A protein has these predicted regions:
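Terminal amphipathic alpha-helical/low-complexity segments used for targeting or macromolecular assembly
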Residues: 1-5, 10-11, 16, 53, ...
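Structural signal for interior beta-strand "rungs" in well-ordered beta-sheet cores
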Residues: 1-187
Length: 261
């Protein structure tokens, strides 16, 4: 159903099961899948592709040009998966030349009121951005991470899976999987113990992970040497393997360490 006050380009490709409410604007190159609910006063423009069962609340702006002075009207893309919720005043921008011309959001995410996803961001599934959380360009967030209200993430930062960022925080370096961070230019406070419990880990398993994390971040040597000297073979614990893989992969901003480091 398309409301009579909505402006929908005849060049767009929209499944007939999708609802488009009052005063929405849908641009020429937009592709929208099944059973999406575009409630009212929503703008979806650019080369934006949306899969199924997403909800877009009033005054969200999806696919407008990147806020990057280097952007010069290149053809760039925004890809959105399924079962996401974009609350009021959420803004999402497509990519730029410097980031592969593509912003990607996967599935089952919640973007609360006023949150912002900048150009070239990569958001994995089951991520939550609370009210007014903002991502600068090229940020990568892995699955099940949570960002508190009014938090801000620096360009090129990576947030690992199941990480938790407290409200009003400013993050300028990468956050490891399962890390808990709060403050501005601070250190990790601990592991995200609640996130680990939600994942179904026992207390014994969590304690073992904490002990191994302490070895990796031992301040008496570098992280690289701690991994090399203590993890000759790949750890049998999945969560530790994920942390080591994260630390061994390319970082453009450096790694946020723990308070006692």
């Amino acid at each position: 159903m398309i409301h009579p006050t909505a402006i929908v380009s005849n060049k767009s490709d929209i499944d007939t099961s999708t609802n488009i409410g009052p005063f929405c604007v849908i641009g020429d190159n937009v592709k929208i899948g099944k059973n999406n609910n575009i409630i009212s006063h929503v703008s979806i423009t650019g080369f934006t592709t949306i899969k199924d069962n997403n909800s877009f609340f009033p005054f969200s702006s999806i696919g407008a040009q990147p806020q990057d002075l280097k952007y010069n009207n290149e053809k760039s893309y925004l890809e959105i998966g399924s079962n996401n919720r974009f609350r009021e005043n959420v803004t999402v921008n497509p990519g730029t030349v410097g980031g592969g011309l593509k912003t990607i959001i996967k599935d089952n995410c919640l973007f609360m009121v006023g949150s912002h996803i900048a150009h070239d961001c990569k958001i994995n599934s089951n991520v939550i951005l609370a009210n007014n959380a903002t991502l600068a360009g090229h940020v990568e967030i892995d699955e099940n991470a949570i960002l508190g209200g009014n938090s801000a993430i620096h360009q090129f930062v990576r947030i690992g899976k199941y990480a938790m960022i407290g409200g009003m925080s400013g993050v300028e370096k990468d956050i490891i999987p399962y890390g808990l961070y709060t403050g501005i230019r601070e250190n990790l406070k601990s592991l995200n113990l609640i996130g680990l419990k939600r994942k179904g880990l026992t207390s014994n398993a969590i304690n073992e992970i904490k002990n191994l994390i302490n070895i990796i971040f031992d301040k008496n040597d570098t992280i690289e040497n701690n991994i090399k000297n203590n993890f000759v073979e790949s750890s049998e614990i999945l969560e530790i393997k994920e942390v080591i893989e994260f630390l061994n992969s390319n970082s453009k901003r450096g790694i946020t360490t723990f308070e006692n480091d």
